[in-house]
Amino acid sequence: MMVIENPFLSTATSSQTPQEDGVYTSSLHNSNNPFLAPKTERVADPVMESMADDLFNSIQKKKEPSPASSASASPVKKSAEALAERSNSSMGTFDPPPRYSKIARARSTHVASSSRHRSPSHNDSSPSTQSSLKSRGSIRRYKSVREGSHRPGRSSKEPLDQIDRLDVTGLYGSGSFHHDGPFDACRPHRNRNSKKAPVAAFPKDSIANSIPKVGETYNDPSVPKDFSRKAIHESLRTKNILQSPYKSVGIEEEFPSSGNNDTPGLTDSTRIEGAMASKNAIARNEEMLAMEKAGLGRKNSLIRKLGLNRSASMMSRTPNTLNRPSNYRSHSSMGTRRSPLNSPSQLDPISNENESDTDDSNTGLRNRTSPTAAPPPPSRRKTGGLNTRPYPQHAESQMSLPLTAKERSKPKKMGFFRRLFHKKS
């Protein structure tokens, strides 16, 4: 094999002159050896010679070591041989160093971005390349552990609704606690129990959700709407209009609560067609209703047998009082009950009775009662019936007794208004 002579050594040996102290100088000013500068003194060192040989071999891309370099036994030669084993050396290329911004961007990238980098080729199988890749991998693993420990965990809270966002009074900021809204009953975690689910309280085709017909007590969506005058008048009627205004109305008795402990969570408005009760509760309710009906039937039968349904006033009435009409009032009771507001002068100022004579005999005859007839008991005012007493009250007292012959023959005095508007014949 052809051996190429090392130009560095040949130039160095030709320019050296032996001296007494073993020191030689180089007089070549135009030397091509970069390690031998002009006008410098150097000591002959075999280590430097071996390093020059190794450098020349690496430039010439020779894998075989030179004879001169193999003769030297230096620890520096072993490290140089390890560097010379690289197949694709980058000694001949001089790339500029990377910018600082590029290095900072590479450090701030996520761990997942490492997969997007170009994987090393199979040709770069030199020990230095593999060591650099191992060091990069260890640095990235260290970064992933360091960044993963400080990365905030994924929050498992539900997204805030508009009501929670508007609340800024929380101790730990907005959304510290949830405000229940009208749509919370439709959430899945509220309807896990199929028996007591809020959504199951309202059936899909519920009659309670339909528009009621005008003038009807029940809600039937299949019945056509009736907007006639009769239906509207029936719906506008007032109940119990003939009762006394002083009667106390019990709302709890007329509108009993439809509460049922078997359907918890449902109010009276939703129990119209709400969740059904259990079978045991329905059977128990039917038994109680049957017992109540049976008790009422026995009570009515006993009252009919004993005749206790008659009132005490009916039993105490005499035959004479039983034949009288219901609107009969005695003169004494009418006289004592009469008030100044019910006097004839204030009730009908235009009538002829305003200027009635003040004869005591006539008044005595009107108010005179027969000594044989017993005074009837004071009548009780009926709360549930219609008061059919004629109006005004004095008309009944004047027309209850017939007029005497003296009263018939006596001409009636004409009042002021009657004389004013009387036509002269």
Curated annotation (Swiss-Prot):
Q: Which residues carry this modification: Phosphoserine?
A: S66, S119, S301, S339, S370
Record field: compositional bias (Basic residues): 409-425
Segments forming a coiled coil: none
- Annotated Pfam families: Pal1 (PF08316)
Q: Does the keyword Magnesium apply?
A: no
Q: Which residues carry this modification: Phosphothreonine?
A: T358
Q: Where in the cell is it found?
A: Cell membrane
Q: In which family does this protein belong, per the annotation?
A: Belongs to the pal1 family.
PANTHER family with a match to the protein in the record: PROTEIN PAL1
Q: Which InterPro entries match?
A: Pal1
What binding partners and quaternary form does the record give?
Answer: Interacts with end4 and sad1.
Composition-biased stretches, type Low complexity, lie in 66-77
Gene Ontology process terms (BP): clathrin-dependent endocytosis
Name the gene that codes for it. Answer: pal1
Q: How does it sit in the membrane?
A: Peripheral membrane protein
Positions of region (Disordered): 1-204, 307-425
Keywords annotated in UniProt: Cell membrane, Membrane, Phosphoprotein
Compositional bias ranges of the Basic and acidic residues kind: 144-167
Q: Which GO terms describe its cellular component?
A: cell division site; cell tip; cytoplasm; medial cortex; plasma membrane; site of polarized growth
Residue stretches of biased makeup (Polar residues)? 8-34, 122-135, 310-353
Look up the signal peptide feature and give its range.
none
Taxonomy, superkingdom = Eukaryota
What biological function has been recorded for the protein in this entry? Answer: Involved in cellular morphogenesis and cell wall integrity. Important for the maintenance of a cylindrical cell shape.
For this entry, the protein name equals: Protein pal1
